[in-house]
Amino acid sequence: MLARPGYASEQALLDAAERLLVEAGAAGITTRRVAEEAGSNHGLVHYYFGSIEQLLVRVLDRFTERLIERQRQMYGADVPFLERWRTAMCYLDEDRAYQKIWFELQSLSWNRPELREHLAQVHGDWQQVLMEAFAPVRDRLGIEMPLDALVTLVYTFNEGVMLERLCGIETGHHELLEWIERWLQQREEAV
């Protein structure tokens, strides 16, 4: 199947916006800068995306789709949960570009209700991935916490770690992750 006309230009703009979001942040992005980075005409940003904000939303959505697919495959793997947990925690280091994009758009959404609604949908997609991953584990390990509460705990824990790491703060992270791993290991052994 052939790509639709303009697909390569559109992808180049998305790639450029992704790089700029990571390197310069949302405040450093202009239509002209994205177009220049993509080797394209700045009018194409508006043609394909309507606005710079919509371009940034598409960057987030494209990145999110890739990572959610990866997470679902990882959580669906036939390996002990502790191995899946370790892999997920390694992703905290590997996914810093996505994390920066996520927090850049979160900060933009504080004053843009339409963007806030979209980010709430993305948040819901991530929560669904965690619900699917943790429901059988919670029951098997006898974790007496409502599933919604467990997922919220894990999600906000991850966001806190990500935000601190983006700020250059890693104090206590290694120790906390080791403690959680030991706790999970003890739960696994007790089953």
Predicted regions and their residues:
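Short, basic, alpha-helical segments at the C-terminal edge of helix-turn-helix-like DNA-binding modules
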Residues: 61-66
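Amphipathic alpha-helical packing segments from all-alpha helical-bundle domains
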Residues: 68, 73, 94-103, 113-139, ...
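Hydrophobic alpha-helical connector segments
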Residues: 58, 69-99, 147-154
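Hydrophobic/aromatic-rich alpha-helical bundle segments in the mid-to-C-terminal region
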Residues: 116-120, 137-191
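Helix-loop "lid/cap" segments that line or gate small-molecule binding pockets
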Residues: 87-93, 100-112, 183
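Residues in soluble alpha-helical coiled-coils and helical-bundle/repeat scaffolds
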Residues: 39, 50-54, 76-79, 93, ...
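N-terminal intrinsically disordered/low-complexity leader segments
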Residues: 1-8, 191
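Helix-turn-helix
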Residues: 9-12, 16-54, 58
